[in-house]
Amino acid sequence: MATRTQARGAVIELLYAFESGNEEIKKIAPSMLEEKKIKNNQLAFALSLFNGVLEKINEIDALIEPHLKDWDFKRLGSMEKAILRLGAYEIGFTPTQNPIIINECIELGKLYAEPNTPKFLNAILDSLSKKLAQKPLT
């Protein structure tokens, strides 16, 4: 059975495909997840994350942007966007504890992105989680 980390990794891959212009990914996501041995509760978890990010993508991007400092969101790589969007969605819209989310995103960054990406992800998601702790989403 897949772990939540593996489910999140698969969601990152789906979000990456979506960001790269693959609109069909929304329709085939369940079968792609099952091919990766993500089933039952983890399948439901992964689909809820994927669909949640897509449903709130504009709101998520607006949450991330102020924390980028000298970066332009449009210039970020597709993988970085995918990981940030997943992390921001979980921080803002799920009950999972923020340190767990941030750690998972850092680990996914180590697997899927450039060597400096985990530090970047940590800084952005930590800043976002602190802001939302002061002023939660309504």
UniProtKB/Swiss-Prot annotation:
A Pfam family of this chain: NusB
Entry's Gene Ontology BP terms: DNA-templated transcription termination; transcription antitermination
UniProt key word Transcription: yes
Alphabetical keyword list: RNA-binding, Transcription, Transcription antitermination, Transcription regulation
Similarity comment text for this entry: Belongs to the NusB family.
PANTHER family: ANTITERMINATION NUSB DOMAIN-CONTAINING PROTEIN, N UTILIZATION SUBSTANCE PROTEIN B-RELATED
Function (record text): Involved in transcription antitermination. Required for transcription of ribosomal RNA (rRNA) genes. Binds specifically to the boxA antiterminator sequence of the ribosomal RNA (rrn) operons.
HAMAP family: NusB
The name this protein goes by in its record: Transcription antitermination protein NusB
Species of the source: Helicobacter acinonychis (strain Sheeba)
Upper taxonomic lineage: Bacteria, Pseudomonadati, Campylobacterota, Epsilonproteobacteria, Campylobacterales
